[in-house]
Amino acid sequence: MKRLLVLCDCLWAWSLLLNALTERSYGQTSSQDELKDNTTVFTRILDRLLDGYDNRLRPGLGERVTEVKTDIFVTSFGPVSDHDMEYTIDVFFRQSWKDERLKFKGPMTVLRLNNLMASKIWTPDTFFHNGKKSVAHNMTMPNKLLRITEDGTLLYTMRLTVRAECPMHLEDFPMDVHACPLKFGSYAYTRAEVVYEWTREPARSVVVAEDGSRLNQYDLLGQTVDSGIVQSSTGEYVVMTTHFHLKRKIGYFVIQTYLPCIMTVILSQVSFWLNRESVPARTVFGVTTVLTMTTLSISARNSLPKVAYATAMDWFIAVCYAFVFSALIEFATVNYFTKRGYAWDGKSVVPEKPKKVKDPLIKKNNTYTAAATSYTPNIARDPGLATIAKSATIEPKEVKPETKPAEPKKTFNSVSKIDRLSRIAFPLLFGIFNLVYWATYLNREPQLKAPTPHQ
């Protein structure tokens, strides 16, 4: 009896195990069948959508205007080339429109497709008006996305890198601001056939990623959107425009240009504190500073396009050059008057010639005796001369000529009044110029000169 019960339990356990395995196998088969059914349904929907579809014709042809809604997500902005007046931007460009021919009904509400389907349906012929070169990314496959909803609304997204023109006004360089446009629209369809609109409100239609700035010399202040109509010989076309507002960073130019110019001007004014007789030293100061300013002015223009007007930096360099050249002219003036022997009051200084002193004759006891003659008669040999020697005795005595008190002579080892005046005038004028210059440009409100589409 016990053996029978054990056998029954074993049979019951085996039956449960077989039942579980059977249900699991049936579930897997059911899932595979369901997946196979979904794939089949998906394929049938696509085949039915493309059956009789002509991608050469726009949606609503002859009935309505095709509305294309767009928005842009900027993944990378920059770099910006001042010399070529262009910038590079990497974007996800999204377009959405409605095509009633692509309506469908099925278990899914959205068909998520790739670029293969995009080539079989009608898509807008959008191009960039100010684009110099546009590249659609194809690695590892074309970076395109297509989604079709059951009511026939399509979302078409692609990744693009665009190099576009950016007209720049460099009058305020390097304190300038710019509005770089990105213009796009239909190439073949006029506004009577295809119109463009922004998907969202203007503030959200164009978004820049937080880490999307690739700018070394600019700050991206923001972006604005606009739309307009452009008239051409083939009709009127809708043009969508996005302006990216840029402000230049001045730090690089302060280090590379402004500070060297200021130091060069200060160095040229050091010569005012040297003696006017130090011709070699003052000449070296003047010539060296002039050549330095010439080199700085040339290097400052290398990174800029050859514009026909003067920039703010050009005016600063020109004034600094004028100060340096004026310091050299000032030394030439001082040296001219020094060589001519003229002082500041206009009186000439004539060096006094030394007077010749003649040997005087001294009269003594009605007898002239040469003061510088040393004559001793030999009285022993000539006794007759004893009497003469008594009456005419030679007294060798040095007689000093009468001299007048010397007048104080003017010396040239002094400071010129021109130098004294220049020591005050040059630094004062240069300081006033810097005060006016920086106050004018740094406190100026940015004036964004953005070209507007023709209405």
Curated annotation (Swiss-Prot):
**Keyword terms of this UniProt record:** Cell membrane, Chloride, Chloride channel, Disulfide bond, Glycoprotein, Ion channel, Ion transport, Ligand-gated ion channel, Membrane, Postsynaptic cell membrane, Receptor, Signal, Synapse, Transmembrane, Transmembrane helix, Transport
Q: Where is the signal peptide?
A: 1-27
Q: In which tissues is it expressed?
A: Brain.
Segments on the Extracellular face: 28-253, 302-311, 441-455
Question: What biological function has been recorded for the protein in this entry?
Answer: Alpha subunit of the heteropentameric ligand-gated chloride channel gated by gamma-aminobutyric acid (GABA), a major inhibitory neurotransmitter in the brain. GABA-gated chloride channels, also named GABA(A) receptors (GABAAR), consist of five subunits arranged around a central pore and contain GABA active binding site(s) located at the alpha and beta subunit interface(s). When activated by GABA, GABAARs selectively allow the flow of chloride anions across the cell membrane down their electrochemical gradient.
One Pfam family named in its UniProt record = Neur_chan_memb
- Name assigned to this protein: Gamma-aminobutyric acid receptor subunit alpha-1
Q: Which PROSITE patterns match?
A: NEUROTR_ION_CHANNEL
Q: Which family does it belong to?
A: Belongs to the ligand-gated ion channel (TC 1.A.9) family. Gamma-aminobutyric acid receptor (TC 1.A.9.5) subfamily. GABRA1 sub-subfamily.
Report residues carrying sugar chains.
Answer: 38, 138
Disulfide connectivity for this sequence is 166-180
Q: Which gene encodes it?
A: GABRA1
Cytoplasmic membrane side: 275-279, 334-420
What is the regulatory mechanism acting on its activity? Allosterically activated by benzodiazepines, the neuroanesthetic alphaxalone and pentobarbital. Inhibited by the antagonist bicuculline. Potentiated by histamine.
Q: One GO term of the cellular component aspect?
A: chloride channel complex
Q: Which Gene3D superfamilies match?
A: Neurotransmitter-gated ion-channel ligand-binding domain, Neurotransmitter-gated ion-channel transmembrane domain
Cellular localisation: Postsynaptic cell membrane; Cell membrane
Query: What's noted about domains in the record?
Result: The extracellular domain contributes to synaptic contact formation.
Q: Which amino acid positions bind 4-aminobutanoate, per UniProt?
A: 94, 157
GO MF, one example: GABA-A receptor activity
> Known InterPro entries for this protein?
GABAA/Glycine_rcpt, GABAAa_rcpt, GABBAa1_rcpt, Gabra-1-6_TM, GABRA1_ECD, Neur_chan_lig-bd, Neur_chan_lig-bd_sf, Neur_channel
Q: Which SUPFAM superfamilies match?
A: Neurotransmitter-gated ion-channel transmembrane pore, Nicotinic receptor ligand binding domain-like
- NCBIfam families reported in the protein's UniProt record: LIC (TIGR00860)
- State whether it acts alone or in a complex, and with which partners, per the record: Heteropentamer, formed by a combination of alpha (GABRA1-6), beta (GABRB1-3), gamma (GABRG1-3), delta (GABRD), epsilon (GABRE), rho (GABRR1-3), pi (GABRP) and theta (GABRQ) subunits, each subunit exhibiting distinct physiological and pharmacological properties.
The membrane topology term of the UniProt record is:
Multi-pass membrane protein
